[in-house]
């Protein structure tokens, strides 16, 4: 199943959580926090303004992003957990 987001929505795959702390302690699955970083896997066509024009999104497929802990709606597609969120829920793009 493929999810094609509408308007200013973005589909994000969470990046894997770090399972060790900085001091080397291994965290069990329940203790590890869900990461607040992900990779954009699909983007909508853009937000429609009051004048009817469409503003393209600033993020694109493949971008690594940072988002809020409670951002987006969790959905499952082909057994994979994804997030669907608005572009305004994204804090920034991680650049290398």
From Swiss-Prot:
Pfam families: Cpn10. Its main location: cytoplasm. It comes from the Bacteria. CDD domains: cpn10 (cd00320). PROSITE patterns: CHAPERONINS_CPN10. Keywords: Chaperone, Cytoplasm. Together with the chaperonin GroEL, plays an essential role in assisting protein folding. The GroEL-GroES system forms a nano-cage that allows encapsulation of the non-native substrate proteins and provides a physical environment optimized to promote and accelerate protein folding. GroES binds to the apical surface of the GroEL ring, thereby capping the opening of the GroEL channel. This is Co-chaperonin GroES. It comes from Neisseria meningitidis serogroup B (strain ATCC BAA-335 / MC58).
